[in-house]
Each structure stands twice: as C-alpha cells, then as structure tokens.
Amino acid sequence: MQKDVEYIELLDEQGEQIKFKVITYFQIDEINGEYVVVTPAENDECDEAFVLKVISDEDGNETLVSIEDEKEFDLVEEAYNLVMSEQD
C-alpha cells in the first residue's frame, strides 16, 4: 500500500464504494504487521476510526481486513497511540 495516499475507497457489505480518509499508516515489526487507520471521508466531524490490517497475497496484491484477534488489536491500539503522540 502506498504510504502517501490521502484517501482510499472500500466496498461495504452491499458492494457500494465508500471513500475513507487515511489518518495514518504504520508497521509493527514485532508481529510483522502493516496497518492503516481510516475515517469516513464524507463526515469530517466523525470521531469514528477504523483500523485495518494490510494483507499481501503471494502475487503481492494487497487486501485490507479488520482485526479479529483481541491481543493483536491491543498491540495495534498501543502502536497507534504512540504514533499519534509523536505527531503532536
């Protein structure tokens, strides 16, 4: 995934494209994971953010998926808070 992308479009459950603003992109070396934090682009006042994991297949194609594992999510949340505190 390009690290300098400002917006991405994702498909919802109904197959419709929704535009998201990329808040930040980061890696966690300890668990060999890449993550992106996004928020809906249409609603600038939305406090809701989504953390997605970047998964690459054997051909190098990337897919964004939600994080199901609670321990992984806790590590990602901690890393995100650190990244955001460094940006302040």
Swiss-Prot record:
InterPro entries to which the protein is assigned, alphabetical: UPF0473
Protein name: UPF0473 protein CLL_A1177
Highest taxon of the lineage: Bacteria
Protein family membership: Belongs to the UPF0473 family.
HAMAP family xrefs: UPF0473 (MF_01448)
Record-linked Pfam families: DUF1292
